Amino acid sequence: MATVKFKYKGEEKEVDISKIKKVWRVGKMISFTYDEGGGKTGRGAVSEKDAPKELLQMLEKQKK
């Protein structure tokens, strides 16, 4: 499975694509929420050019 690498509040993070719940576009950034485990939801964003193709595919599916 693919992973998404991003920075959130100055901290480098990496999350598996399978844990991502919701994806949306904000300008040239792709924002998302993901399951952190223990009932917590995390969020992150990555630039469109750095986003893995699986994340972009999820975005297209949610538009429909």
From Swiss-Prot:
The UniProt entry, under InterPro entries, shows: Chromo-like_dom_sf (IPR016197), DNA-bd_7a-e_arc (IPR003212)
Residue list for modification N6-methyllysine: K5, K7, K61, K63, K64
**How is activity modulated by pH?**
Highly stable from pH 0 to pH 12.
GO function term, MF aspect, one: DNA binding
> What family is this?
Belongs to the 7 kDa DNA-binding/endoribonuclease P2 family.
Q: What does this protein do?
A: Can constrain negative DNA supercoils. May be involved in maintaining the integrity of the genome at high temperature. Stimulates the Holliday junction cleavage activity of Hjc.
Q: What name has this protein been given in UniProt?
A: DNA-binding protein 7d
